[in-house]
């Protein structure tokens, strides 16, 4: 990113540190599948591309990537439902 090279360099360094640390209790495949799920939930096209490719390189198959996407969709839907219930509770109290 031309406008903020320092920030971009820091972000990429953080990415490398977290995703490539060897003393982590999570292996690369697990990290990438978690990242795929989060990327789907945050709706970041760049992140989806990077982490699906990373998951594939770490050994993920299509079913694992699909499961990560579906789990994140489920959790996201659950959060939306909970906020809907909150809206209805507030409506009852108003």
Model-based region annotation:
Residues 8-10, 50-64, 88-91:
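Iron-sulfur (Fe-S) cluster-binding segments and ferredoxin-like electron-carrier domains
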Residues 19, 35, 52-56:
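Amphipathic alpha-helical segments within well-ordered protein domains
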Residues 27-28, 45, 62:
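Alpha-helix N-cap/helix-initiation sites
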Residues 30-39, 66-74:
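Alpha-helical scaffold segments that form or flank carboxylate-/histidine-based iron centers
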Residues 66-89:
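C-terminal structural segments of small proteins and small subunits
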